[in-house]
Each structure stands twice: as structure tokens, then as C-alpha cells.
Design a protein with these regions (language model features):
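Small-residue-enriched alpha-helical segments and adjacent helix-cap loops
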Residues: 1-126, 155-157
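Charged substrate- and nucleic-acid-binding regions of tRNA-handling and nucleotidyl-transfer enzymes
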Residues: 121-162
Length: 162
């Protein structure tokens, strides 16, 4: 987990209070990109050094964009892991507050320029997305997560077939 938003949120709020939409949006864009770039850098360090499963990897920027490396880094709240409440489990493991990150009631990370990911190093791993699920699958997920059906419908509304 990385954040580039610590301290930036108060500056962004100041810009907004002053009616400076341009600098507010610019700051948000810069901090978002910085967080994403740092997450990608750490993923590369994991592949090449920390876990060392691809020590000789030498990819161009183009190849990095095309995900030509081994392994994936899916993130909670994105198409492969749409249940943002999983961030609460991640928080129990990582204690996000140590780096100034907290969760909203819906499980979104604040500051918003914060990125998490789950490293999967298997050579055949690929990014994926959860498609539509039917009523039975939704009920099964609610049971497995110990959530009400209403909570799951809210969390996964884009994934539930009508």
C-alpha cells in the first residue's frame, strides 16, 4: 500500500475553498499519478529483488504498459476485486493508519491518492474482471462474507444481473 495524499488533501481543500479549481485538480492528478507510479515501482522491486522471481527482467515502458512482466497486482475496488469492504480486512493486516490512511464507511481509502494491491507471482497469472453474477451467486457471496443481501447488492451493483 502506498499513499501520496498525506498532507496533499489539506492543500487541495485550501485550493477548493479559494475557488482555485485548476490547482485542486492538478494536485489531485499529480498525487494520483505519484501513488500509481510508486505502486508500479514497488511491484517491479518485488519481481526483481524482494521476491526475486524475475531478477533479470528488463522491460521497456511500452512493455510495462502491456503487462509483459510475470505476475499481477490486482487492487481492491477494481474489476477483479470489486468488493471495497475487503479493504477492512487489508487494514487489519497492514494497519493503514501508520501511513495516514483511513477507510470511509464504504471501504474507500482516504486520502484518495492511495493505492493497494495484492501481489500474485504465478507465471500464468493474468488480470481478470468479475463479470455479471446472478441472484444465487449474490446470495452465496453474502453468506460467505457474512453480509446482508442488501449490502452485497450495494457493493456489487455493477456485477449483478437484472
Amino acid at each position: 500500500m502506498v499513499t501520496a495524499g498525506t498532507g496533499a488533501e489539506s492543500l487541495k481543500e485550501r485550493f477548493e475553498q479559494e475557488g482555485d479549481t485548476y490547482n485542486s485538480m492538478l494536485l489531485q492528478t499529480l498525487t494520483d499519478r505519484l501513488a500509481e507510479a510508486t505502486a508500479e515501482y514497488l511491484h517491479e522491486k518485488v519481481r526483481k529483488e524482494y521476491w526475486g522471481y524475475a531478477p533479470d527482467e528488463s522491460l521497456s515502458i511500452s512493455d510495462l504498459y502491456k503487462v509483459k512482466y510475470q505476475g499481477i497486482r490486482p487492487a481492491i475496488g477494481y474489476p477483479s476485486l470489486p468488493d471495497q469492504l475487503l479493504n477492512y480486512t487489508l487494514d487489519k493486516l497492514l494497519n493503514m493508519s501508520q501511513i495516514g490512511v483511513r477507510l470511509t464507511e464504504n471501504g474507500a481509502m482516504y486520502p484518495t491518492a492511495t493505492v493497494s494491491g495484492i501481489y500474485i507471482a504465478h507465471p500464468d497469472s493474468q488480470y481478470f474482471m468479475i463479470g455479471n453474477i446472478d441472484e444465487e451467486q449474490m446470495k452465496d457471496y453474502a453468506c460467505r462474507r457474512n453480509l446482508s443481501e442488501a449490502e452485497v447488492k450495494k457493493l456489487l451493483n455493477k456485477n449483478i444481473s437484472n
